[in-house]
């Protein structure tokens, strides 16, 4: 039979010394790389000097358990105090007392090898703190870790019991201390007692009596359902309809970035959709049964399954409320990762959360992490109850209530005195909250998301650059933040509206059993917390430090960051600097170069015809360019068919001096020369034609461009002899060049202006977005890439299309031909009508 609830009298004996009770013991800890687990391991090693600690860590393909323990636990700043106290002996002490065991709580048998089983068999106490702690964890992973994990740990202990009896015949059975959550009480109101749901169900008590969810659930069916949902969603995500949507969205985000990048983004969108659907499925199932989300739901069922499946084990259940930064140990404010409150606080301080649901008179039940770690250690030292599974709440709401309204007042006052600064260097004024219902806040944020999403789509579709593109990037960032704020309301709103009060009778009984000395070292009484001091002087300073928000005027910081990035880019240590041409070196493009060359020797009347034809085709040209830059260039360059190569090359010299030089960016030219002066190899990589860029060749060490073939009569065929390097081809060509020259792309720079240049920018260590269009501006802002805004040499007005000098006395080689009369016609541009023909060349007169 499972153990039943114990009485307070059963645990009334004094504990002379926690360190003494655990001396010589081996304590096996799961979840040691997490927030609570790291604090627990550090506290054991520092405050229980004669115990051994073993940690279960899942190996990765790159790192074994020992490497992860060293990197993710021992090197964490949580250990700074112990490192300072031990000095030079720190490494040897850690090596002698801390061991890492490879394994995984989501695997039956924990994935232990023989050595791992030996260590588990020797453990006197197992603290199971591993959990999928995110409130938005996918239902299948929450089931594997939170629901099945505790029972798997119990099964592994039982499986090792025979070995323990053989190897350690004088030792008592292993004591399992499992960390659950107080919020498995669900959405009930009133006092939630330290009782197992199975005991409440067995006694016939109603849910409202114990303020816990006592709904009977078929746990096996829930596990099967979660696994099946994953399988079903994975299958649906691969249907043609879904894949088309993901691909379309990827193209909208990245434009003509290239097949591989678009495929990667579409696959990421598919995976995100599966995950979001799993989260929603978990939330819906949990709320249908009385829990706010999959976290509380799976933790509750995991606790039930453990005590039902393993009645033979001595078990203590520790249920913390919301765990936050340390009150004092190892140092005030220590935190690892953001918990529940931090994202809400930072979003509020940024002015993003104008409202948040909650009951101002309600209790915000949070507890510092060091109090939880101390309570777990004390529970381990006290040992298990002789006849029952002991349950301990580690919560503050009853013992030392902290009202939600007061928390908001403290946060508002603190950020009024210490505001966060926005990107313009202006302090952000925090709003007043009126504590509306969750539904109202969600509707407000949903409307804001819709409006910002529309603005983002509109701006990204416009051909804007520079400051206007930066505006689009800011809108995208704002939309992303608003989307995140909505998710916070959906995730955490239920917790700020919780009216359950978690009693701590057994916790305080345990506290009263401690000696005065242990109460100093292992403090876990919530009554010691001064909430005003904790929020103002401990928690909020820690939150802003870890959030890395701007707490001073932003402009000097931004200027300093810009200068640091520029110094890194212009370091002599760099190897290569690659430059795009259009809107990076010159404010021009292949269409303008063609228009200038095509009209160079045309009389006035024919000029109007050719320009009108190009403008008429502009929408289809733009659509093709956005879809595939390579297809656009191949199609557009067919217009050069029949042109005399010698004449075009001669005219291209004029093009450079009359147009390109005027539209060049002096800062770009200076930057190329600066790189050359620093000894960097300079490369121009462009889809423009060789005769257009030929005058620029002296500026660069290498020019990689497109080239048209020539027939036996010296005329351009309109077909490419050397393909234009676009999309992924740019990255591949540059990588080949760097490899052949012994250059490291990780120590190289790339300058480009468009999202279609992403492969080029991503293949180097120092990407620079120059005069970026809207999509690239948003990407660069998100990734923290260096950005340059360069002005052209001539700032005068620009014509729609530039025209070559009027010279009707020389040869004219352009005319309109009927496509139907040509046997080898170039591919027609998508979207053009039969009468909208390409302008092609003919023999010179």
Where are these regions (language model features)?
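N-terminal Rossmann/SDR dinucleotide-binding element
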Residues: 1-125, 129-132, 139-143, 148-151, ...
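Conserved beta-loop-beta element that borders a ligand/cofactor-binding pocket
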Residues: 233-280, 284-294, 298-333, 385-392
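Glycine-rich "substrate-gating" loop/helix at the edge of Rossmann-like oxidoreductase active sites
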Residues: 290-294, 325-338, 358-370, 398-400
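Alpha-helical substrate-binding/gating segment
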Residues: 307-309, 342-357, 364-421
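Mid/C-terminal beta-alpha module of Rossmann-like enzyme folds, strongest
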Residues: 382-491, 499, 506-513, 517-520
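Non-catalytic pre-domain segments flanking phosphatase-related domains
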Residues: 537-581, 816, 820, 844-845
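C-terminal cap/substrate-recognition subdomain and adjoining C-terminal extension
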Residues: 563-568, 572-574, 650-651, 657-845
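Active-site neighborhood of HAD-like aspartate-dependent phosphohydrolases
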Residues: 569-624
């Amino acid at each position: 039979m499972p153990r039943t609830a114990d009485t307070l009298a059963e645990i009334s004996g004094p504990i002379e010394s926690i360190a003494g009770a655990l001396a010589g013991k081996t304590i096996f800890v799961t979840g040691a790389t997490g927030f609570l687990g790291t604090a627990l391991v550090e506290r054991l090693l520092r405050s229980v000097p004669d115990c051994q600690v073993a940690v279960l860590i899942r190996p990765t393909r790159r790192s074994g358990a020992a490497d992860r323990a060293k990197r993710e636990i021992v090197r964490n700043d949580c250990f700074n105090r112990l490192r300072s106290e031990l000095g030079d002996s720190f490494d040897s002490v850690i090596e002698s007392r801390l061991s890492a065991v490879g394994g995984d709580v989501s695997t039956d048998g924990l994935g232990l090898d023989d050595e791992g089983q030996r260590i588990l068999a020797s453990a006197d106490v197992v603290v199971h703190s591993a959990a999928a702690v995110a409130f938005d964890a996918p239902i299948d992973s929450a089931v594997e870790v939170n629901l099945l994990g505790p029972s798997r740990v119990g099964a592994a202990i039982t499986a090792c019991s025979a070995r323990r009896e053989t190897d350690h015949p004088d030792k008592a059975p292993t004591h399992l201390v499992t960390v659950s959550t107080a919020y498995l009480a669900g959405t009930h109101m009133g006092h939630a007692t330290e009782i197992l749901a199975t005991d409440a169900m067995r006694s016939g008590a109603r849910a409202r009596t114990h303020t816990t969810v006592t709904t009977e659930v078929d746990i096996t069916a829930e596990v099967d359902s979660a696994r099946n949902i994953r399988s079903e969603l994975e299958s649906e995500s691969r249907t043609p309809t879904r894949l088309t949507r993901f691909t379309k969205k990827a193209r909208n985000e990245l434009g003509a970035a290239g097949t591989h990048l678009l495929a990667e983004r579409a696959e990421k969108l598919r995976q995100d959709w599966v995950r979001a659907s799993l989260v929603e499925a978990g939330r819906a199932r949990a709320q249908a049964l009385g829990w706010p989300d999959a976290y509380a739901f799976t933790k509750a069922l995991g606790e039930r399954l453990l005590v039902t499946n393993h009645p033979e084990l001595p078990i203590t259940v520790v249920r913390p409320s919301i765990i936050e930064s340390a009150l004092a140990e190892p140092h005030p404010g220590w935190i690892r990762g953001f918990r529940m409150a931090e994202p809400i606080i930072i979003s509020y301080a940024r002015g993003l959360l104008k409202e948040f649901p909650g009951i101002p008179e309600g209790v915000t039940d949070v507890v510092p992490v060091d109090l939880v770690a101390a309570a777990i250690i004390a529970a381990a030292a006290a040992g298990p109850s002789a006849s029952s599974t002991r349950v301990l709440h580690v919560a503050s709401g009853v013992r030392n209530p902290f009202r939600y309204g007061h928390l908001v007042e403290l946060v508002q006052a603190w950020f009024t005195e210490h505001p966060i600064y926005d990107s313009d260097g202006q302090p952000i004024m925090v709003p007043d909250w009126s504590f509306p219902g969750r539904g109202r806040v969600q509707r407000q944020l949903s409307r804001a998301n819709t409006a910002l999403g529309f603005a983002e789509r509109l701006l990204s579709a416009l051909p804007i650059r520079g400051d206007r593109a930066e505006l689009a990037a800011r809108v995208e960032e704002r939309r992303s933040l608003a989307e995140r704020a909505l998710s916070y309301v959906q995730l955490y709103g239920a917790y700020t509206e919780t009216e359950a009060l978690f009693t701590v009778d057994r916790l305080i009984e345990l506290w009263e059993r401690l000696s005065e000395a242990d109460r100093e070292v292992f403090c876990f009484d919530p009554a010691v917390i001064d909430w005003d001091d904790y929020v103002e002087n401990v928690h909020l300073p820690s939150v802003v430090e870890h959030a890395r928000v701007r707490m001073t005027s932003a402009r000097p910081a931004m200027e300093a960051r810009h200068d640091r990035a520029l110094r890194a880019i212009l370091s002599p240590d760099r190897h290569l600097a690659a430059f795009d041409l259009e809107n990076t070196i010159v404010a021009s493009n292949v269409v303008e170069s063609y228009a200038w060359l095509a009209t160079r020797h045309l009389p006035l009347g024919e000029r109007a015809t050719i320009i009108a034809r190009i403008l008429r085709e502009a929408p289809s040209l733009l659509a093709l360019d956005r879809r595939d830059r390579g297809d656009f260039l191949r199609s557009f360059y067919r217009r050069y068919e029949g042109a005399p190569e010698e004449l075009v090359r001669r005219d291209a010299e004029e093009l450079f001096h009359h147009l390109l030089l005027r539209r060049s960016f002096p800062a770009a030219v200076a930057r190329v020369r600066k790189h050359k002066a620093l000894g960097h190899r300079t490369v121009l990589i462009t889809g423009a034609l060789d005769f257009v860029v030929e005058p620029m060749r002296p500026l660069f060490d290498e020019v990689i461009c497109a080239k048209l073939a020539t027939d036996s009569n010296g005329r351009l065929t309109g077909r490419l002899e050397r393909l234009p390097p676009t999309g992924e081809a740019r990255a591949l060509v540059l990588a080949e060049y760097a490899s052949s020259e012994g250059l490291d792309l990780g120590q190289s720079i790339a300058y480009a202006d468009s999202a279609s240049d992403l492969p080029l920018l991503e293949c180097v260590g120092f990407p620079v977005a120059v005069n970026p269009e809207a999509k690239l501006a948003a990407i660069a802002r998100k990734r923290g890439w260096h950005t340059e805004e360069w002005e052209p040499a001539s700032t005068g007005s620009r014509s729609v299309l530039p025209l070559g000098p009027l010279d009707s006395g020389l040869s004219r080689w352009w005319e309109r031909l009927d496509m139907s009369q040509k046997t080898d016609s170039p591919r027609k541009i998508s979207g053009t009508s039969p009468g909208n023909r390409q302008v092609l060349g003919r023999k010179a007169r």
